[in-house]
């Protein structure tokens, strides 16, 4: 059985491999997802300038106050990041799942962002 440390090393290698091919621009920035055991974080990044344009996480007070499950929190983070992005005029993004499988919390965040108006 693969240990937790080895799983994270494999994820980081996968993420590095994908990042060589994937980057965000000002017209189509990158939506990056980081998942910890308890929280989930999302940022929209312009890699050309090297700056974060928008961020949302399950630690935000308005998101964390009334959710019970981690999948519900991920859905709310996806909706929040899409709302903040539309306020900044961002409609199209490149989705970077951070080496995680497109399943569970990562999938919930992505689908909520899509339903809230982001295109990817």
Swiss-Prot record:
Give me the Gene Ontology terms describing cellular component. Answer: cytosolic large ribosomal subunit
NCBIfam families attached to this UniProt entry? L18_bact
Q: Which gene encodes it?
A: rplR
List the protein's name: Large ribosomal subunit protein uL18
Cite the SUPFAM superfamilies for this sequence.
Translational machinery components
Q: How does it assemble?
A: Part of the 50S ribosomal subunit; part of the 5S rRNA/L5/L18/L25 subcomplex. Contacts the 5S and 23S rRNAs.
Q: Which GO terms describe its molecular function?
A: 5S rRNA binding; structural constituent of ribosome
UniProt-listed PANTHER family: 39S RIBOSOMAL PROTEIN L18, MITOCHONDRIAL, LARGE RIBOSOMAL SUBUNIT PROTEIN UL18M
The entry's family comment says:
Belongs to the universal ribosomal protein uL18 family.
Keywords for this entry?
A: Ribonucleoprotein, Ribosomal protein, RNA-binding, rRNA-binding
A GO BP entry = translation
User: Which Pfam family, giving just one, matches this sequence?
Assistant: Ribosomal_L18p
Q: Which residues form a coiled coil?
A: none
Q: Which Gene3D superfamilies match?
A: 3.30.420.100
Please name the source species.
Staphylococcus haemolyticus (strain JCSC1435)
Concerning InterPro entries, the annotation shows: Ribosomal_uL18_bac-type (IPR004389), Ribosomal_uL18_bac/euk (IPR005484)
Q: What does this protein do?
A: This is one of the proteins that bind and probably mediate the attachment of the 5S RNA into the large ribosomal subunit, where it forms part of the central protuberance.
Q: What is the lineage of its organism?
A: Bacteria, Bacillati, Bacillota, Bacilli, Bacillales
């Amino acid at each position: 059985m693969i240990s937790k440390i080895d799983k994270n090393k494999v994820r980081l290698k996968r993420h590095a491999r994908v990042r060589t091919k994937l980057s965000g621009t000002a017209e189509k920035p990158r939506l990056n997802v980081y998942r910890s055991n308890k929280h989930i974080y999302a940022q929209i990044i312009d890699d050309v300038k090297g700056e974060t344009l928008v961020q949302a996480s399950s630690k935000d007070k308005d998101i964390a106050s009334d959710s019970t499950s981690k999948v519900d929190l991920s859905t709310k983070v996806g909706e929040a990041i899409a709302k903040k992005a539309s306020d900044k005029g961002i409609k199209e993004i490149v989705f970077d799942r951070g080496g995680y499988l497109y399943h569970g919390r990562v999938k919930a965040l992505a689908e909520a962002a899509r339903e809230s108006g982001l295109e990817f």
